[in-house]
Amino acid sequence: MNETTRRFARLVDLSAVQATSTEADVRACAELATRYNIISVHVLPCWTRFLSTLLPQQGTGEVMIGGPVGFPGGGHATDTKVQEVRQLIADGAREVDMVVNIGKVLSGDYDYVREDLRRVVEAAAPVPAKVILETHYLNEEQIRRVCDIAVEVGMKWVKTSTGWAPTGATVEKVSIIADQLKGRIDINVAGGISDLATVSALYQLGVRRFGMSHGAVTKVLAELEQHPERFPELNVD
């Protein structure tokens, strides 16, 4: 494994968070994450405890478990999201990815959004929390408002998408997020990230975490093993 491949693996949220994700998918993600020392594996809550039994058995101490909260629509009551956070952490999660209440954002109820995010951050601490915007449904003003709220309440990351909407991370929407955050907190993308060219383009915008499927990660890792020069940004010390 070359150094570029190693560095890329530490930028990856390996994800199996579709409704059809199976035990075999979770096992495959655990195996791939262990082999490449991928930074995290994200699964649906019903698989969190199971995943936590796989990773130690495979000898890794550096692969985190991530779990979704209010997934995928964000419309769960805040109390429900808080309980989800507590259960995920009890089951082994070391990151939580909360879906913003999309309907409240579209309604302009930013006081609700702020309190929703704040309580999840509070419940998760010291485990870092991310907020998923589901940018497919939000306009520029809404994206900018939620980014500012995320910073205000102590979110560690802003994430573009769940992977369940018609579109995921796009250069246009990520550019808006990057412009609004200005490095105050980090950017995580997900949804439709399937090739090295896309990863490289988004990395240049400031993205430092990529939510990707097993197939997509395998494809990019294989390309980097053969052609590390195609991601020159990771070759700079």
Where are these regions (language model features)?
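A general structural detector for well-ordered alpha-helical segments in enzyme core domains, enriched
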Residues: 25-29, 84-85, 113-120, 146, ...
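Glycine-rich phosphate-binding active-site loops on the catalytic face of alpha/beta enzymes
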Residues: 15, 67-72, 90-105, 152-167, ...
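Catalytic cores of alpha/beta
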Residues: 52, 76-87, 138-149, 176-183, ...
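Conserved N-terminal beta1-alpha1 strand-loop-helix module at the mouth
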Residues: 1-90, 140-145, 149-152
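Conserved strand-turn element in the central/C-terminal portion of the radical SAM core barrel
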Residues: 99-103, 129-138
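Glycine-rich, proline-tolerant flexible connector loops at the mouths of alpha/beta enzymes
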Residues: 30, 34-50, 54, 96-114, ...
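Alpha-helix-loop-beta-strand connector modules within alpha/beta enzyme cores
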Residues: 45, 49-71, 108-135, 144, ...
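Short, surface-exposed connector motifs at secondary-structure boundaries
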Residues: 30-38, 127-130, 154-159, 181-185, ...
